[in-house]
Amino acid sequence: MAEKNHKPILIVIAGPNGSGKTTITSKVLHHEWLEDAIYVNPDQIAQDKFGNWNDQDSVLKAAQYCEKLREECLRNRRSLIFETVLSTTSKVDFIKRAKEAGFFIRLFFVSTESPLINASRVAARVMEGGHDVPIPKIISRYTKSILNCAAVSPFCDRTYIYDNSINGREAQLLFRMSDGIIKKRYTDNMPEWTTEIIPSN
């Protein structure tokens, strides 16, 4: 246990657009794990550093800036936390490289039972001034995100899987994994979307 405490820590909050990542992040940020960690937040950087999170140029610049920041943390073995849709292999690759570099990795993954739920939430978020994501992207990223969670969980020291399908209710912790193996189940009623993540043996 003492050895773990000397490792740099990587916290990844992942899930399809509109699943509720930011709510989980706001809770995790207060944890003692992250006392010296850098929070890499592209939305905040797009707004604060480049002017507007709904402007495509600002979003692109913020994404590039965040990628450099993550790579610097990896190179310097500096603890960090970031949110991701996890729909591309680049983030999977980053997590694998962090594992090879000796980081202690915690993955918090949250999804819903249908991408239509996610699309409606993103639409509501836009009405309140939040950033937009086109519906076709939300739908295509939904499955990719879940499949990539399954691919990367064996490289994570701790993985926490949440379902956030019910509006107005806190996301439900379904199960916890270590190195891709389920260590604790918190419910007997697993949503269908988790079948891609739950190990077959």
Where are the regions that the model predicts?
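A glycine- and Lys/Arg-enriched "phosphate-lid" helix/loop adjacent to the NTP-binding pocket
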Residues: F103-A151
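Walker A (P-loop) phosphate-binding loop of P-loop NTPases
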Residues: G18
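NTP-dependent small-molecule kinase module
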Residues: A151-N201
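The Walker A (P-loop) glycine that initiates the GxxxxGKT/S ATP-binding motif of P-loop NTPases
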Residues: V12-G15
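Conserved substrate/cofactor phosphate-moiety recognition/catalytic segment
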Residues: S26-R78
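Glycine-rich phosphate-binding loop used to anchor ATP phosphates in small-molecule kinases
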Residues: K61-V110, S145, Y160
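Phosphate-binding P-loop
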Residues: M1-K7, C73-L74
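Conserved lysine of the Walker
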Residues: K21
